[in-house]
Structure formats: C-alpha cells, structure tokens
C-alpha cells in the first residue's frame, strides 16, 4: 500500500511512487503536465516523462525529468499518405512504449491527450497498469475520446465537459503552471479614467496571425484619447512583427511586440484586459489570476473545443466570447472603447473569472493519480467548474 485516505479527503503518501507522464505537443497538453509534475515532485515521487521524438526540449519542471522519446503520429486532418504514416508511427510507438513500460514498471501512467500520449497510454492499458488521463478542454480531443473508457480514471477540467461514451469523469479543474499560480494573490489593478490602460494580446503557444491584422486595425479606430492611454503588449509571429509595429507607430500607440515573452505570467498579471484565443491553458490561467478577457476561439480547432472553453468563462461573466467569423475591427473597437470607459465592468469580470478558477487543480489531480496507483478514489467535493 502506498497511500492512505484521511477523513478530509486529502491523500497522505506513505512511500514514493514511480509515475510516468505521457505528454507532448502544444502548450495546452504540456502546461498541465508541468503543473502536476511540480506537485508530485513536492510530494517526493519519482517521475519519468514519455514524449514523442519530435517533441520540444522542455524547460521548467519537465526539463528536469528523466525523459524517454518514442514514435507517435497523428492522423486527424491529414491526407491518405499522412494518415497511413501516422498509423504506422502509432503502431511502432506503441511497441516502443510497451517495452519501455515493461522495463520501468511505473505505479501509474498519466496522459494529457494529444497524439504524443496515445502510444504510451495504449501500452499501459495493455499491460494493465493503473492509468489516468486528464482532458483539458470542455470538448475532449480524439486521443482522449479513444482512451476515456479504457483508463482507470478520467479526469476533466470542466464540470460540464462533454462525456465520452463509457467514461466516468472526475472533475479536478485545469492545473496551471506554478509560475502563474504564484501570482494569484496579487489582485486586479483596475484601470483609472485618463490613465494608462494595459492591453495584452496573445495567440497562445502557436500564435494567432489574425490578431496581427485585426487588432491594429481596431485600435486605429479608437478615439485619440483612447489611443493615448493604451500600453499594448502583443505576441506576434516573427514574420508579422515589423508590419504590426509600423501600424502602431503610425497611430502613436505605445506597443511592445515579441514572438515570445518569457515573463508572460507577469504580463498577464499586469494586464487590465487580455485579447486571446481560448485554449484550455489560457482559460485556466485567466481564471486562476482573475483577469478579464475578450476570447476569440481558434475557428479551425477539431470539434471547435475552444468555443466551448470560452463559453464557460463568458457565461459566468469572466470574459466576452467574440467568434472570429463575426469579429471586425469596428466591432472590436466598439467593445474596447466601452470597456476602457467603464472600469467597473472590468472589475466585475475579473472577480467572476477568479471565482471560476480552481487554484488547487494540480493538488486534486495529484491526489487522484496517487489514489489510482493505490486503487483508491479520493473524495473530491463537487464543484461547478467553468474555467
């Protein structure tokens, strides 16, 4: 027995566990793995990261882990040859993962969705190892749809998340990076009439080209008084930076542009308003810090999961869902002008966003992982989690 469960539902670990994390791909799959890894390391567990051969060299907590790389291939959105190649890579990766897990014999294997996790999770299921998958989005991705009914426990970020057939979800919330969670204690600094208005525009881990054209056009439509107040921080793709900078300079708008901000959590903390995509990690971080946002879902996401994510925050009053198809410079300028003129609306939205956050999501997920390794299920109080 590795763990025991006291009456309050918190898990007490008696012996270190060996836990394998299967993660890779975009930040939406990697950031919750990083958050969980930090909590598990704090508890004294041994971790191994299993990712795909094309994966990034990770920094932060994941960069400190013993890392194994296997083949993995996706099939969604690819042509016939691409799908065939993906299926071959999936089969070969599953064989590699099977041999790796037989050798490592972890106490539990945890997956975070995306094609990079599938070979390892299929191998773990075949070996009858305890397994957990965490679904970040309100609409599950194809990888977790495949796995949800087969794994030991299926954890979700949203209480109203779509439930795959045969799955029994456990709501834990969206684990956010420790660097973000550390700033949760710093409250929302409401903008003051006539003074600086800090606007953060970020397109997520893959950037958002539409923001490079639409946002500068919208800001140019604001009144001179509004433009003079703006302090813009914008993430752009490298090839877009010079054009965006020229537009802002022509309008006299103070702007800092970069393809990457290493201090993005601090910039998120300092923002009066955020314009962003609505990936699960982004929505989770907005809620953790309590920052109001205009949410523009990526319209080409499979199953349109970003719209479902954004709707959760919009419905509790923590942000404003603006679909890209209906978003024009005029519509965005009108919304921005209204918000800049009414800071009380932003304050209320910040409070609503914060109320939707689940700051202990990494702890909840770590409890579930530890309990699954010991064939127990922790008692988690129900909570309507919207972000």
UniProtKB/Swiss-Prot annotation:
Positions with a binding annotation for UDP-N-acetyl-alpha-D-glucosamine? 26-28, 137, 177, 205, 306
Function of the protein: Cell wall formation. Catalyzes the transfer of a GlcNAc subunit on undecaprenyl-pyrophosphoryl-MurNAc-pentapeptide (lipid intermediate I) to form undecaprenyl-pyrophosphoryl-MurNAc-(pentapeptide)GlcNAc (lipid intermediate II).
Name this polypeptide is given: UDP-N-acetylglucosamine--N-acetylmuramyl-(pentapeptide) pyrophosphoryl-undecaprenol N-acetylglucosamine transferase
Mind telling me which Gene3D superfamilies this protein's record contains? Answer: Glycogen Phosphorylase B
Where does it localize?
Answer: Cell inner membrane
GO terms assigned for molecular function: UDP-N-acetyl-D-glucosamine:N-acetylmuramoyl-L-alanyl-D-glutamyl-meso-2,6-diaminopimelyl-D-alanyl-D-alanine-diphosphoundecaprenol 4-beta-N-acetylglucosaminlytransferase activity; undecaprenyldiphospho-muramoylpentapeptide beta-N-acetylglucosaminyltransferase activity
**What is the name of the gene encoding this protein?**
murG
Q: Where are the transmembrane segments?
A: none
KW Nucleotidyltransferase (keyword) present: no
Listed pathway(s): Cell wall biogenesis; peptidoglycan biosynthesis
Q: Which GO terms of type biological process are on file?
A: carbohydrate metabolic process; cell division; cell wall organization; lipid glycosylation; peptidoglycan biosynthetic process; regulation of cell shape
One Pfam match, by short name? Glyco_transf_28
One GO term describing the cellular component:
plasma membrane
């Amino acid at each position: 027995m590795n763990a025991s469960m006291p009456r309050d539902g918190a898990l007490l670990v008696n012996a270190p566990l060996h836990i394998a994390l299967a993660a890779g791909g975009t930040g939406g799959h990697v950031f919750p793995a990083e958050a969980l890894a930090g909590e598990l390391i704090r508890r004294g567990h041994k971790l191994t990261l299993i990712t795909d051969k094309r994966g990034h060299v990770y920094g932060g907590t994941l960069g400190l882990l013993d890392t194994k790389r296997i083949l993995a291939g996706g099939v969604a959105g690819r042509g016939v040859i691409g799908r065939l190649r993906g299926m071959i890579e999936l089969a070969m990766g599953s064989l590699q993962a099977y041999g790796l897990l037989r050798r490592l014999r972890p106490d539990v294997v945890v997956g975070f969705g995306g094609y990079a996790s599938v070979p390892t999770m299929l191998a773990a299921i075949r070996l009858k190892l305890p397994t957990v998958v965490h679904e970040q989005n309100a609409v599950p991705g194809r990888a977790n749809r495949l796995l949800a009914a087969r794994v030991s426990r299926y954890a979700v970020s949203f209480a109203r998340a779509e439930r795959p057939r045969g799955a029994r979800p456990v709501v834990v919330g969206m684990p956010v990076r420790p660097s973000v969670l550390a700033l949760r204690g710093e409250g929302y600094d409401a903008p003051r009439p006539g003074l600086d208005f800090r606007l953060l525009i970020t397109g997520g881990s893959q950037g958002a080209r539409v923001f490079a054209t639409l946002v500068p056009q919208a800001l140019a439509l604001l009144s001179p008084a509004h433009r003079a107040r703006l302090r813009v921080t914008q993430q752009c793709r490298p090839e877009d930076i010079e054009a965006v900078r020229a537009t802002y300079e022509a309008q006299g708008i103070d702007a800092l542009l970069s393809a990457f901000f290493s201090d993005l959590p601090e910039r998120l903390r300092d923002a009066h308003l955020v314009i962003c995509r609505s990936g699960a990690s982004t929505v989770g971080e907005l809620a953790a810090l309590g920052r109001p946002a205009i949410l523009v879902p990526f319209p080409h996401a499979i199953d349109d999961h970003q719209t479902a994510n954004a709707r959760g925050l919009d419905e509790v009053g923590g942000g404003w869902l603006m679909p890209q198809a209906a978003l024009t410079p005029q519509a965005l300028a009108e919304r921005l002008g209204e918000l800049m003129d009414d800071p009380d609306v932003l304050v209320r939205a910040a409070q609503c966003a914060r109320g939707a956050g689940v700051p202990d999501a990494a702890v909840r997920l770590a409890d579930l992982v530890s309990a699954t390794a010991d064939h127990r299920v922790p008692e988690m109080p129900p909570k309507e989690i919207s972000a």
